[in-house]
Amino acid sequence: WNACTKQSDCEEDECCLDNLFFKRPYCEKRYGAEQRCSAAAVYKEDKDLYYFTCPCVPMYECLGKGSLDENGNTVMKNPKCIMPTL
């Protein structure tokens, strides 16, 4: 893996990720079009790093069918990287 300190250290289909398990951030592949994804990607603008997981490739969003759990929280079912429609 390639160590990084900011997004521009990585390829376009990667993100600079600090997943808290490794001592240093590294370049990780972003989720591709129609791939299952995690909506847990958190971007910290001041550090120019993502935490937990990478987002989808540019122009795609991690979206799924929203449903409510027993506590009234919205949960995404089967999220995938899709291009949002206008």
Curated annotation (Swiss-Prot):
Entry comment describing in which tissues the protein is expressed: Expressed by the venom gland.
Keywords for the protein's UniProt record, in alphabetical order: Secreted, Toxin
Cell location: Secreted
Stretch forming the signal peptide: none
Main location (coarse class): secreted
Cysteines joined through disulfide linkages: none
Cellular component, GO, one term: extracellular region
Superkingdom, natural source: Eukaryota
GO molecular function, one term: toxin activity
Family: Belongs to the neurotoxin 20 family.
Protein name from the UniProt record: Toxin CSTX-20
Native source species: Cupiennius salei
